[in-house]
């Protein structure tokens, strides 16, 4: 990956979604191949995403890097449009990687935003449910939970 993630063909733009979907793809590769290099790389990139996009005071990812000065405000995207939002995808990724402490903080923050933006956050709702099921010790993956016989 040449040590840097880019948005599309741009060498300068990058968003949390770029990280979130790459991490998701690496998690899927690990699930299919059981090759730990994919899981290790997903954890490394997740840590980078936490450093670049995660706002500690709000326990949520902002859309653009924290250090960028190209906009007048720090956008936080929690709504789904044509693709799931980056915060919901990162919550799913953190759970899949076993980064439960980070996932718990993000889950609680997204849960607070739900009261304001319920209609725009279907992926966040599914991500929070997924986190809560795994956190409770259930055997789940991104397709759902298995019932014990």
For every predicted segment, state its role:
Residues 1-149:
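Glycan-recognition and catalytic cores of secretory/periplasmic carbohydrate-active enzymes
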């Amino acid at each position: 990956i040449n040590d840097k993630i880019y948005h599309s063909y741009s060498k300068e733009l990058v968003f949390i979604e770029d990280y979130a979907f790459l991490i998701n793809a690496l998690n899927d590769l690990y699930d299919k191949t059981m090759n730990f290099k994919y899981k290790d790389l997903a954890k490394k990139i997740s840590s980078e995403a936490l450093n670049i996009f995660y706002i500690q005071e709000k326990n949520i990812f902002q859309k653009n890097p924290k250090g960028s000065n190209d906009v007048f405000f720090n956008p936080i995207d929690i709504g789904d449009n044509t693709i799931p939002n980056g915060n919901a995808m990162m919550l799913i990724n953190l759970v899949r990687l076993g980064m439960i402490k980070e996932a718990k903080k993000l889950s609680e923050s997204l849960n607070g935003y739900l009261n304001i933006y319920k209609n725009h956050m279907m992926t966040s709702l599914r991500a929070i449910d997924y986190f809560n099921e795994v956190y409770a010790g259930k055997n789940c993956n991104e397709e759902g939970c298995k019932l014990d016989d």
